[in-house]
Amino acid sequence: MSEVDETAFEPLLSEEAQKGLRGPLRPGDYYLFGSDACVEGAILAGCRYYAGYPITPASEIMEKAAQRLPQVGGRFIQMEDEISSACSLIGASWAGSKPMTATSGPGFSLMMEAVSFAIMSETPFLIVNVQRPGPGQGYITSSQEDVMQARWGHHGGGSLIALAPSSVQEMFDFTIQAFNYAEEWRVPVILLADETVAHMREKLTVPPRDQIKVINRIKPQDLGIPLEKYLPYEPYEGKVPPMPAWGDGYRVNVVGLVHHPDGNVTKYSPEMHLACVSRIYQKIEDHADEISQIEGLFLEGCKNLVVAYGTTTRSAVEAVQELRSKGKKDLGFLRLKTLWPFPDHKIRSMVGQLENVFFPEMNLGYMIHPLRETLRDRAKNFISIPCLGQLHSPDQIIEKIKETIGK
């Protein structure tokens, strides 16, 4: 590990440094909390606006954003609740910013109406959900219980994107990727973290700036569209409509109602409704192979498969490696980096016929359902390995596998 650049933390060390602006982290190696890595990734992605309300275990992201955003010329605001926080992101996005917030289960529930509005109005922003157990207030430890809510919690149709990081490095990398997805597809993106990865401290490597891919939304002026011919919800042969900011001179309709390409909401018809909602749904689902990310280990000749996502990946990989070292050479591993859109085609392209599929999740077994639908003709048995309130140990996973396929 190279030496940490201490000047990156000057604002913590002197009042003089705190008076000036300081840019994003310089390239190099750092030793950071997952929450801090998330904020630093957001800054490098171009985020300059954070609105939020504190909730354990997501408050550290808010605290770091409150410290760091003013240092890079950004804005931080603590809102009165999670409802206003999410709604504030909509306004900030249309003002031309790349906005974000962070919350946990109870707060995430309160944000669902704004998420639905953002899907319909095609407003890009990032919500980091540092998941905690539920229902209700549940507890403040680790969980993966909001994975279905991320996709289906908003009302109505439409689709969105959700990623699941497993390390401090991925809290940084996936935050940048999440902003890129939001900007490219004009959609809210959910980063499904959890208490474990948010509060762990690990090495973070910040690559050189020219190696960090940052995508910005396409504006109508980029395409040479005249002011008088601009239609707010017309893709113009692209994947999504170009998005101006307020003040750019274009007529902007921020519409939560079903609408025509020009933003008109008064000439309703079932045909118009179908066309509108189908487009905002299909722009994500029809490009699932382009958006989704998975990775596999030991898949050649695999007859028994362990699938995981998020921090559960860490225990699952260790369990697979331990069993393979003891002779279980037909045991493979598949990791879902993207949960939504669900990577069904990619999964089918990577695995063959299977005897057993094991799926450890920090919930009662949620993502095993779309996986079963995807591999219903490829696998005989689907075995959920649930755990609530804490990360699985590798031994828990090993025990279930041995119980099923023998010692």
Label the model's feature ranges:
Residues V4-L12, V189-E295:
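Conformationally flexible catalytic loops at phosphate/diphosphate-handling active centers
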Residues E10, E355-V357, E361-K407:
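Peripheral docking tails and interdomain loops at the edges
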Residues F33-A37, I284-N304, V317:
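Glycine-/acidic-rich phosphate or pyrophosphate-binding loops and their flanking alpha/beta elements
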Residues T141-E195, I218-D222:
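Conserved thiamine diphosphate
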Residues T313-M350:
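Generic long, charged, amphipathic alpha-helical segments
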